[in-house]
Amino acid sequence: MRFLKPRNLPTRIATGAYILHAGLEKWHGDEERAIAVHGMAAGAYPMFKDMPPTRFLRLLAASEIAVGTTLLLPFVSNARAGAALTGFSGGLVYMYLRTPALHKPGSYWPTPAGVGVSKDIWMLGIGLGLLVDP
């Protein structure tokens, strides 16, 4: 098993800390935030429509905490960390693409409302990079 390579430290630390922080913020999110996040996700993923918003936010937060921690742990291989990040960010990119208000009509370029979510594309790129450099 291969472990963390020094050349991957900057991307793993920056991305891991960012995702971990986002998860911790969501973990303590209020009902208003839960409704907003749930509504966006349920629009792209209909299977979430029947899930209570607060439960959805808590599960999303737990996922972010797990992925962020995985990236930060030095004994987790690049392949495993990359797989976790690719799966997680791939789901976010899919949501971005399925939500018309987030990107310009007929384009993948973000609208002002979509800029915050469009950053998930670079996380997908980092995840794929970790997968090809195990």
Language-model-detected regions and their locations in the chain:
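Membrane-interface extramembranous regions
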Residues: 1-66, 73-134
